[in-house]
Amino acid sequence: MKKVFTIIFWVLFAVGLILIVFFASKENNNAIAKKPDISIHVEGENAFLTESELLDRLIYKRLYQKNMKVNFVNVKKIEAAIIKMEEVKKVRAYKNIGNSWNIDVELRNPIARIFTLSQKAYYLDDEGFTMGRSLLHTAHVLVFSGFITEIMEKASVKEIINNDSLKSIRKLDDIYRISNYVCKDSLMNALIGQVYLEKNGDFILIPLVGKQTILFGSANSDEVVADKFNRLKVFYKEGMPHEGWEKYNTIIVKYEGQIVCRK
């Protein structure tokens, strides 16, 4: 008999626990959702989206409204909407116990600003993806201009390299190699401010200091780019202190194994 009472006790306990969880969950779903706790992370200093801007976009899309009940907060739809924003690299939205919920966002990190021949402006991020310009934010990054043809929106360097039909915008991968090197090298990052693409495909680097220009030439591989910048750094560290910043008008690293200076 004692064993029967024990079994009945635990059955009733389990049923009671299930009922408590059920009604607590039902009550929670009918509760008013708090404003989301939004966390935005970006490598570097160029953040193209703030917490308040993201919240405004969610409100505009009616994915979140003031006094919205918890059960109407659809985190999957919210994630799907946010990941489509071209500034966003990763997103995770989730509910907590009670009526609080979170949105964690990682933004793309722009490393170059590109102006095409028609004066359309794009950004290129550190993974080789293009981003449209922002009306609210400007990134302090390397600027590219010159004979740059149209760049399709949301193109990536990887897509261009692996797709023969995208050869018309092939220079995007060259732009990525130069900007990726410059942003990671403290000396070049402090020195180079602009890059101009000539009609013949040569890149011209324009320093922030001095009046000279740097004829860089092509940038068709990571090895070529690294070799040219290494030669340039040797010149700036060892030659420039003796020659002075104003002695030469043009520094040429276009040709393999050479540094040529012209007055």
Task: For each feature predicted by the language model, list its residue ranges.
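Charged, solvent-exposed interaction patches on well-folded alpha/beta domains
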Residues: M1-V42, E51-E53, L58-K84, K89-K263
